[in-house]
């Protein structure tokens, strides 16, 4: 051995004067490899989709691909999120509370305080970063919404872009929403134009499915045994609710019953399925109309449901069509995800893929009382009129609109709960759809679990399913402990105790807490979309499983 040869401490070969007597060692430079037979992982994150929307959760929107996953897995009837998109996605990917990782609110509302700075620390690594160090290929497709605004440009450091947070490939949009016909696309680390136009049959949901399949297939051609993690986040059902007319027309007449009747029909379906207990009662559609703010402000008109019986025929026609368009948007996107499932099945990967399906929060009330042909009006405190929307009635869902249904449908799609997205104090904001499937690893198929689960519990459970301890270091950085708790035991045994005892909620001035049996806590309502002032509500909220006594929480 030659002294001072520059040999690294990890090198276990031999360096001699004669190369014929030397032995190389490639170990220190080898790429990480996954354990034998490690499963693939697919996270499917829907947007703004309430628990009473899909047919497999009792709703009236047909979702055959989601039902296909549910039939091969477990539905969670007591799954909860953060009430808003960026925080939920941060909690999902890190296995920690959103406030732990600086994401107390969406990127657009972040402030220079530790829990709300919009920058996920590197000592709270994403699942993608951990799996990349364990031999997985990692792909992010669709909505991201975890990059600070000042980094969302080509001159930035891109430290919080997907490709800097453990994802090898990215195709999607950095912000919270985008046009589904003409999206703002980023491919890996640079902006690109859509590959086609709506006139050519382009829609973002199809494009995202194509890219998901492409990314997986490209790697499998080279390394067929290498597992992958795909984080797939379609724009559906966030506004704009864009879809081809023929898909909206599939629901012609489906919602003519109105949103109050929809709630009654769906509640009975939920009871029959076991999504809610048989003695569950509906909450009122306008539970806080009599509540005033500290200076006597009335409950905001933007957050008020117009009773269906108070509408004239033209208004009913418009409101029903807006729901048809939304339903068509979801079903079309479901069909594109079905293509991903078909590819996985045809390539022999489906049974050994852990699939996690969630919605990031409850249905959105951002359409205001009348719905809108331009969602941006809501964020500027402007309530769209029926007269304005009727001018574009035949264009709803097309490139000429940026549409959103009326708030009454948000209450309907969150049946049986109160309120909607943004409200961490009420189940309408935080009680959401969730499905977990892994045919080769989870014996339960087509079953429902009512164990209390929070979004931060998902990734700890996936680590548990993999037989993998949460990493102590990632990229050489010591990691903080996870906040979430694995519920793997409950997937096998519905009576299992997951060990979870407490979960807190906070969003834009609203708050709630679940503790063992669901202890209530005072609630405050969030700021109006056009301002940052909050208006207190009366009463209290509980995040427990609904019963006849507490279904209105």
Question: PLM features: what roles do these ranges have?
Answer:
Residues 1-540, 544, 548-553:
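Formylglycine-dependent sulfatase
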């Amino acid at each position: 051995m030659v002294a001072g040869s520059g040999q690294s401490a990890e090198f276990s070969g031999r360096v001699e004067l004669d190369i014929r007597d030397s032995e190389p060692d490639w170990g220190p430079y080898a790429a990480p490899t996954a354990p034998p037979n490690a499963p693939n992982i697919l996270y499917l994150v829907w947007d703004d989709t309430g628990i009473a929307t899909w047919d497999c959760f009792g709703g009236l929107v047909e979702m055959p691909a989601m039902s296909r996953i549910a039939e091969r897995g477990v539905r969670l009837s007591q799954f909860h999120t953060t009430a808003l998109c960026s925080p939920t996605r941060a909690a999902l990917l890190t296995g920690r509370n959103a406030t732990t990782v600086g994401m107390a609110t969406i990127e657009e509302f972040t402030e220079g305080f530790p829990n709300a700075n919009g920058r996920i620390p590197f000592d709270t690594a994403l699942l993608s970063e951990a799996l990349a160090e364990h031999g997985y290929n990692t792909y992010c497709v669709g909505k991201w919404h975890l990059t600070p605004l000042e980094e969302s440009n080509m001159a930035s450091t891109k430290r919080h872009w997907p490709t800097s947070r453990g994802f090898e490939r990215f195709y999607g949009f950095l912000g919270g929403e985008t046009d589904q016909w003409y999206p703002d696309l980023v491919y890996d680390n640079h902006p690109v134009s859509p590959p086609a136009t709506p006139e050519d049959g382009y829609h973002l949901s199809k494009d995202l499915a194509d890219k998901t399949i492409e990314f997986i297939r490209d790697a499998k051609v080279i390394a067929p045994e290498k597992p992958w993690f795909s984080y797939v986040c379609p724009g559906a059902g966030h506004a704009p609710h864009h879809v081809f007319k023929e898909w909206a027309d599939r629901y012609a007449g489906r919602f003519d019953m109105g949103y109050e009747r929809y709630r009654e029909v769906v509640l009975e379906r939920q009871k029959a399925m076991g999504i809610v207990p048989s003695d569950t009662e509906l909450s009122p559609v306008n539970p806080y109309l009599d509540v005033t703010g500290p200076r006597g402000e009335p409950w905001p008109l933007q957050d008020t449901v117009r009773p269906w019986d108070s509408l004239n025929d033209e208004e009913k026609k418009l409101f029903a069509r807006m729901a048809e368009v939304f339903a068509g948007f979801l079903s079309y996107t479901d069909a594109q995800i079905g293509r991903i499932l078909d590819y996985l099945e045809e390539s022999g990967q489906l049974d050994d893929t852990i699939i996690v399906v969630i919605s990031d929060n409850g249905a959105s009330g951002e359409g205001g009382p009348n719905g809108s042909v331009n969602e941006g009006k809501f964020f500027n405190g402007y309530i769209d009129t029926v007269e304005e929307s009727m001018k574009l009635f035949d264009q709803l869902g097309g490139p000429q609109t940026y549409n959103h249904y009326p708030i009454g449908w948000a209450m309907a799609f969150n049946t049986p709960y109160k309120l909607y997205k943004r409200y961490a104090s009420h189940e309408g904001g935080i009680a959401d759809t969730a499905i977990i499937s892994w045919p080769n690893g989870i014996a339960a198929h087509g079953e429902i679990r009512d164990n209390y689960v929070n979004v931060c519990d998902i990734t700890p459970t996936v680590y548990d399913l993999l037989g993998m301890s949460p990493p102590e270091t990632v990229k050489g950085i010591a990691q903080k402990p996870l906040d979430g708790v694995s519920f793997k035991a409950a997937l096998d045994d519905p009576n299992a105790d997951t060990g979870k005892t407490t979960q807190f909620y906070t969003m834009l001035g609203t708050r709630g807490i679940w503790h063992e049996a669901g202890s209530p806590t005072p609630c405050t309502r969030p700021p109006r979309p056009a301002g940052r002032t909050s208006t207190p509500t009366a009463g209290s909220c509980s995040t427990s499983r609904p019963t006849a006594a507490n279904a209105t929480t």
